[in-house]
Amino acid sequence: MKIHREGYPTILITFIIIVLINFLCFYSTKLIFIQLPILLFTLIFFYLILHFFRNPIRDVEINNKHIIAPSDGKLVVLEEVFENEFLKENCFQLSIFMSPLNVHKQWYPVNGEVIYSKNHDGKYLVAWHPKSSTENERSTIVIQTKEKQRVLFRQIAGAVARRICNYSSRGDKVNQNMEAGFIKFGSRIDVFIPKKSKIKVSLNDIIIGGETILAELYI
């Protein structure tokens, strides 16, 4: 299992704490029915941390017409909205909720140039709260395709996720097989796409980052 680089510090700290806990346990008592459950619990916990920071390699099919899912999760919002931060127009919003068991790496949804990238401080409301998109800690990235269509996606911190890693800078040339960022410990991704796009998913669908086609751009 390949581990994402964002997990290295957390994994190292967790490993040290687990070693100390088990050392103290085995040093302070000889009772096997105390030692073994603690050892088992800490090993399971360490495995879950490793599993959270897994970094799967996916065969992303690059297609200029496709808007691919930037993350794993479940599609919890699919509606027409007015995007107020940058696009300033009506568009479709697709929101993907990530549980702690999902892969938390993000991919770019389209090919093009990053024309906007901004990090916002904020609250830590639960990721499914309607106001989390505008009030939580978040990063907003806008990509303009060669056909001048713009797709905005937003990394949103949740009640557990307290760190967003945004790898985008204005002027970057990006494509769909490139890594866009990482969010630690559960959160949400909002994607805002042109109204003329043809939606290819339905509400409550299970989404696979880098593979699921959310929509097709009108070209």
For the regions a protein language model found, what residue spans apply to each?
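Contiguous, well-folded functional domains in the mature portion of proteins
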Residues: M1-I219
